[in-house]
Amino acid sequence: LIQKGLTGDLMKELMTLIHKENIVVQKVPIQKLNHMVKKNHQGIIAMISPVAYHEIDWLVQQVYEKGEDPFILILDRVKDVRNFGAIARTAECFGVHAIVIPSKDSALITNDAVKTSAGALFKIPVCKVTSLTSALDFLKGCGLKVYACSEKSETLIDKLETTGPKALIMGS
């Protein structure tokens, strides 16, 4: 969160870095910042994830090195933190090795997401990628078969042959 109306060379430099890292920015009135924190905020409040993000290439390699078939969940435009947490909780029960999310148009991993996940977000690595298409191409190149969920499908997931390395796409 950045206070509306902040200007200057340092602000320009900060905004350049923010855009380079694909960080979501919201400009808000100073009153909102004052309400959120009681200490000096200098016009900026950063919300950081309670979990660290991982690199997808490293994770897939680690799963293969353990002698397991990767099972990767890809979430496309899941924006509600509680839905994200509930999906992570279910994914952990089904043995998902990692969750892949886009750096834009995705729920942030907040305390609410972690709480709803019942701690699953501390167990399942999350990968944040700039392009889901590139991530899918990478996963296919690693031998994963890709499945996509749709409410319009006539085939139920339990009827699919899902042995071997796989990625499952879910979204809104």
Label each residue range with its predicted role.
Residues 76-86, 131:
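Amphipathic alpha-helical repeat scaffolds
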Residues 147-172:
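Active-site/ligand-binding-proximal alpha/beta "capping" segment
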Residues 97-155:
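Histidine/lysine/aspartate-rich catalytic loop segments that bind and position anionic ligands
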Residues 36-49, 117-120, 163-171:
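Short basic, glycine-rich beta-strand/loop surfaces that mediate nucleic-acid
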Residues 1-64:
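N-terminal positively charged helical leader segments and presequences
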Residues 57-65, 138-140, 158-162:
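Short amphipathic alpha-helix with an adjacent loop that forms part of the alpha/beta core around
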